[in-house]
UniProtKB/Swiss-Prot annotation:
Mitochondrion is among the record's keywords: yes
Record-level Gene Ontology MF annotations: L-malate dehydrogenase (NAD+) activity
The reaction(s) this protein catalyses: (S)-malate + NAD(+) = oxaloacetate + NADH + H(+)
GO term, biological process aspect, one: tricarboxylic acid cycle
Record-listed NAD(+) binding positions: G41, A42, A43, G44, G45, I46, G47, D67, N127, I150, S151, N152, M261
Organism listed in the record: Citrullus lanatus
Class of the enzyme per the UniProt entry, highest EC level: oxidoreductase
UniProt keyword annotations, A-Z: Allergen, Mitochondrion, NAD, Oxidoreductase, Transit peptide, Tricarboxylic acid cycle
Residues involved in substrate binding: R114, R120, N152, R186
Protein name per Swiss-Prot or TrEMBL: Malate dehydrogenase, mitochondrial
Subcellular location: Mitochondrion matrix
């Protein structure tokens, strides 16, 4: 499914009558339950392409697009795409409740983007407040929805969301996800290039967090297997960790990793929808409440089901390099988690 999304879009461009083929190849099956997805921050750099990709997903029957401005235009534009879902735009805080009501999945790409020289933590003061406000509304209007957190720094915004939901009495650790899928997408792409294997066949788990050294791709577990040198593995790991910076610098101050993030967000949302619909053996990496390490939140492989997280999978065997990386990331990840918790409880 994952590798076929972009092929399907290209197919649709060349054959205007192929919309049904597009859908069947892009995302899953057509005979599915009614599912509402809300995108909060839908007029932004990630939100707009993400809205389009969710419109292409036949598992979605209602698509609610929310932002503080600009969503009526985005909704009108995306709404003309001839696919199953009904699209509605909502603008301003007074319409947030309507956007959220009845949602099965809420995707949150809201917030300010990275700029040259900025780290994800530089975004904290602005995005933390945005996330807290949105999660307060989620707790009120759709407390049972699966939450897909994209807003950075994810290592802190997921703990913020958890604290908001705890205070509201609605917290369910099985329903809160930090979307780290872009790290997996990058790791697969970079590995395929070095291993000279088809990227569609590649699988690479990525654990830890979603910023800098907290991102730890497990290339020792990558498939198909390839005999890569230690230096190559180190370089691949570094490039995966710095992937966001690579895009920010390439765009020369005019954007961040919006398109690839939208793609990754759409992949993870699709996995959540499949899990909700009872599709078996849906496994993705995500930053969730976890006991696989001593840290309260951690990214690893997660099995998705009808209630969200069905199980958090073990890390599996690690190479010596990965064991070292795991120990190095823990202090930074712990500090980011605590920063989010402190923000939520102090404001």
């Amino acid at each position: 499914m994952k590798a076929s999304i972009l092929r399907s879009v290209r197919s649709a461009v060349s054959r205007s009558s192929s919309s049904n083929r597009l859908l069947s190849r892009s995302f899953a099956t057509e005979s599915v339950p009614e599912r509402k997805v809300a995108v909060l921050g839908a007029a932004g750099g990630i939100g707009q392409p993400l809205a389009l990709l969710m419109k292409l997903n036949p598992l979605v029957s209602k698509l609610a697009l929310y932002d503080i401005a600009g969503t009526p235009g985005v909704a009108a534009d995306v709404g003309h795409v001839n696919t199953r879902s009904e699209v509605t735009g909502y603008v301003g805080e007074e319409q947030l409740g309507k956007a959220l009501e009845g949602s099965d999945v809420v995707i949150i790409p809201a917030g300010v983007p990275r700029k040259p020289g900025m780290t994800r933590d530089d975004l904290f003061n602005i995005n933390a407040g945005i996330v807290k406000s949105l999660c307060t509304a989620i707790a009120k209007y759709c407390p049972n929805a699966l939450i897909n957190m994209i807003s950075n720094p994810v290592n802190s915004t997921v703990p913020i969301a958890a604290e908001v939901f705890k205070k509201a009495g609605t917290y369910d650790e099985k329903k809160l996800f930090g979307v780290t899928t872009l790290d997996v997408v990058r790791a697969k792409t970079f590995y395929a290039g070095k291993a000279n294997v088809p990227v569609a066949e590649v699988n690479v788990p990525v654990i830890g967090g979603h910023a800098g050294i907290t991102i730890l791709p497990l290339f020792s577990q990558a498939t198909p297997r390839a005999n890569l040198s230690d230096d190559t593995i180190v370089a691949l790991t570094k490039r995966t960790q710095d992937g966001g910076t690579e895009v920010v610098e390439a765009k020369a101050g005019k954007g961040s990793a919006t398109l690839s993030m939208a793609y990754a967000g759409a992949l993870f949302a699709d996995a959540c929808l499949k899990g909700l619909n009872g599709v078996p053996d849906v496994v993705e990496c995500s930053f969730v409440q976890s006991t696989v390490t001593e840290l309260p939140f951690f990214a690893s492989k997660v099995k998705l089901g009808k209630n969200g997280v069905e199980s958090v999978l073990d890390l599996g065997p690690l190479s010596d390099f990965e064991k070292e990386g795991l120990e190095k990331l823990k202090p930074e990840l712990k500090a980011s988690i605590e920063k989010g918790i402190q923000f939520a409880n102090a404001n």
